[in-house]
Regions:
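Low-complexity, S/T/G/P-rich flexible repeat/linker segments used as non-globular hinges
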Residues: 119-143
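Generic short beta-strand segments
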Residues: 113-119
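Residue-level preference for non-acidic, small/hydrophobic
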Residues: 45, 111, 134-136
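Short secondary-structure transition/capping segments
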Residues: 2-8, 96-105, 136-143
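Short amphipathic secondary-structure patches
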Residues: 49-112
Length: 143
């Protein structure tokens, strides 16, 4: 069968497509999906930060001028992160709030999210996570 140059050339191109080009195309699509998911995580984190910034304990702020979040801030932030992640939840990627912190100097609330993005890649790549952080300003100047 492999007595001509054409047969060798055909076999070489079949091997090249099978082992080089097709896996590279699959990875390129996966990386594109990853960056889209990353942008979605930052959008979700911004929504979660805005929601958490609404959960300021007003009585504590009036007494001490310190921003303290209510205990419900984590749950509200988690709910708003889920509301703003349609692309992710459509692919069974569920962002979860990993941290909420308050910067007293700038009066900003920061929310960090993390999700397992392994479903965007082939099965040999597991443990791929995507992170996002959002910020919102707690505007309490009129109080």
């Amino acid at each position: 069968m492999l007595h001509s140059r054409k047969a060798y050339s055909t076999l070489w191109w079949i091997g090249y497509y099978t082992f080089c080009l097709i896996p590279l195309m699959v990875m390129a699509v996966g990386i594109g999906r990853y960056f889209y998911a990353r942008a979605e995580m930052f959008k979700s984190a911004d929504g979660a930060a805005l929601a958490a910034a609404q959960e300021v304990d007003v009585v504590t702020y009036l007494n001490t001028k310190q921003i303290v979040l209510l205990p419900s801030a984590y749950g509200v932030a988690q709910a708003y992160a889920a509301y703003n992640s349609d692309y992710l939840t459509g692919r069974r990627i569920y962002p979860r709030v990993t941290a909420i912190r308050v910067d007293q100097a700038t009066k900003k609330v920061y929310v960090s999210l993390r999700a397992d993005a392994s479903s965007l890649f082939p099965s040999i790549l597991r443990g791929v996570t995507v992170n996002g952080e959002g910020e919102a300003e707690a505007r309490l100047g009129s109080l």
